[in-house]
Amino acid sequence: MQKAAPRPIIKRSYLNLDAIFGHVFSNLTGEPVTPTKIATFYLLRILFQTHFGFRHKRAYYKPFSPAEKERIFHWLYALMTSVVELSYKDFRIVTRLAFDDGREVCKNFYAAMEKIGAGMADVTLNVEDEFYTNKHPKDPKLPANDTVHEAMDLARGDIIQFSSNHSFMYRWMKRLLAQYTKSTPSEVFQINAAMKSWVLSAVESKYHPEFKGEYLPHFIDCSVRARDWVAKSIYFIQKNPRFAFQYNEMLHYTRIVQKRHPDVVEGFLLEAIVQVQLKDSSSAIKAMKSFFELSMFELNENMVHAAKTHRLAVPTQTPLMYAPILQARICRIFGDYQMARLLLHESLQQAQLRNDEICHQMANIEMHTVDILGCRALLEDNNEKTAKHIENERRVQRKALLHIDDLHGHTRSGPCCLSSEEDFELVAEMDSYGKMLMLMKIIAEGNYKLIYDRVAETGITCPVGNDLGERGRKVAAYGAALISSNMIHNGMYHQAKCAAENMLANNCRTDETDPFQAPFQAEPWAIGAVNLSYSQAGVGNYDAALRTIEEMRQNYPEELSWQSNRHVVICAAVINFERFLLKNDYKACASEVLNLAAHSELECKLRQALLLAAAGKERASVEVLEGLNVVDIRGRIRIHMQTGCIYTASQEFRKAAREFADALSLAENTTLKDIVPMVKRRQATMLMCHGQYVECLKLLKECNEGIEQFGSFTEKACYYMTAARCHRLLGKDPRMWLKKSRALVRNGQWPAFTKLVLSEIAALHDVKGLMPDENRLSQICEQFGKLTADCPGRCEWLLI
């Protein structure tokens, strides 16, 4: 029976990623081949031959000593890193300064250059194998097994080694040779012509390296320097944008890098960062997608497989995990929270499939950032608005990392972590951010928590080693900014001032000449400066607050970092509104309210309602407040307090009492330091206006300690005025409270309130008052008249 023919075995080859991506790894842009670099290469080769010899022949002169090699390498490093092209005349001067001609180094170098200039030799960039092996080949005139070979090698020992395979000089030479070997015959002809012209020219060389017919600046003329420039630009944008290029200029160079150096895929990442700073979200997302698409293949580490298949690239799944996180971050920054959540869900699923702990933790942190804060510049709780998108509470707080061995069960992937130490530092950083997010959630829910020892874990208690990525400083800065913000949130202005000043004082420049030692000008430090201004304004020092704001405007302009600048805009609007309100300048107040509209509806509407009430439109102001849909606990309390104050000013005391009761019921369920005294002070003021003076003094006594410790400048002023008026109307001595009131506004921050204090003093010294004094009364009336001329209008302290 005839056997059936065997079925053919068809081997289906996988996609050739090298061809699809344009042979990126074989088309790297090496060191540009310029006359100065060719001359440096020739000089290096002559120095090696002088030290080692040529082929099997030993050197005529004795080898260089370690001290001599150190001096030689200093000069070679200077020539290799030169940014400008030297003329042949200048190069000759350098060689004469660098080398005494006892070994005829200069003579041999000049002879080689003169041959090229005379057309007697072409440029040949090659080096003997002995440069890499540091071993002489056997003398062909002697038998191969002759013991003389071994004896001569032992006699020379290690002194013939010229350089290390890990040295900068070695890597520079490999880059130059890599670029030269890819040159076409026409390019080789151009190199020879340029070199001949360089040798014969008596003036400074005008030669510029070109790549594909386009001149490239030195910092991006090869893949290595382009990648280094991209990394430095990303670093400076995140730390201090003043030391980076202008964004439009950086975008121009970034696109040149993308076009001319396809292996530098980080150029797309830099473009995405720049587009975020330029507020172009669509272009940023497009660049981020390009970055991860191009990074979906990497260099094959299995050289046996690469040699068999002749393919350098292999696919990687890392972008499937990390790409959604960065894209979601861009969506969050520009307010697209729904898309951000969808992307983060995808990243979490990919991380769970591949058991990547770092990716899983990063996605969790970003998910909580979206759900808790979004991209708001203020500590406001918006959790209820996004509750339908949240499943179960993800656990971002885990066991604290105290040692690198605590990090287990992690499969390292991607370029973000190249060692276990970096894994440990990055996960510790994510854990610290997780703790801070949970603390922010607690603060937004109306709780004051003073345990901060785990907040800045990476920077304080977590051993991060040298902290080369400055993760510890960044986390510590976020923790310090959160501390000072929470203190401002609870009326602890003096403590917040100390915390903010310490934070800013530690952010100093240690070396004026080194940009890497420059102070940080990032968002956490902007928040620290803003909190310093808030703390100054909270105690009535508006001049110092305005000076701080002006300094912040110079340090954080919008064209450098709009994310930091928005804190400055909010701070300036809040403080200037309060300053203009105290001076009865309602027109200026209205312009400041517009600056808050884009950042916080709550802050904007509260101030709009206050202006409407001051203009006598109480009903319209109450409607504005009732139209607010706020879930932030402190925001709801403030709405009730503001509504109650408006009812108090319009003498609708029953409605005011109801609003204050609602505010107090909410405030008593929080642990905020200042909110209960603030509510009770307003209740006391309402009772005073209603004629219930005994009950008013009882409430004032209850909230006295809280107001003195946590009350702002205006809060204390209203408290003292309420106490003074109640004491006077009850026939008691109010001078202690009037003295405190007048001392509080002695610098003229609130002229209308000063008039109110003077009117109380006048009522006290009136003929029918408790302490009649005609002389004192006339003095007070004279002061009142002068103030009225400078600041007309009444004091609307009942609305505050």
UniProtKB/Swiss-Prot annotation:
GO terms for cellular component: anaphase-promoting complex. Expressed in gut cells and mature sperm stored in the spermatheca. Keywords: Cell cycle, Cell division, Coiled coil, Developmental protein, Meiosis, Mitosis, Repeat, TPR repeat, Ubl conjugation pathway. Pathway: Protein modification; protein ubiquitination. TPR repeats lie at residues 526-559, 637-670. The keyword Cell cycle applies. Probable component of the anaphase promoting complex/cyclosome (APC/C), a cell cycle-regulated E3 ubiquitin ligase that controls progression through mitosis and the G1 phase of the cell cycle. The APC/C complex acts by mediating ubiquitination and subsequent degradation of target proteins. Required for the metaphase to anaphase transition in meiosis. InterPro entries: Apc5, TPR-like_helical_dom_sf, TPR_rpt. GO terms for biological process: anaphase-promoting complex-dependent catabolic process; cell division; meiotic cell cycle; positive regulation of mitotic metaphase/anaphase transition; protein K11-linked ubiquitination; regulation of meiotic cell cycle; regulation of mitotic cell cycle. Residues 346-366 form a coiled coil. This is Protein gfi-3. The APC/C complex is probably composed of at least 12 subunits: apc-2, apc-10, apc-11, cdc-26, emb-1, emb-27, emb-30, mat-1, mat-2, mat-3, such-1 and gfi-3. The keyword Repeat applies. Disruption phenotype: RNAi-mediated knockdown results in both viable and inviable embryos, but eventually animals display germline maintenance defects and become sterile. Double RNAi-mediated knockdown and/or mutagenesis with such-1 results in increased embryonic lethality and the production of one-cell arrested embryos.
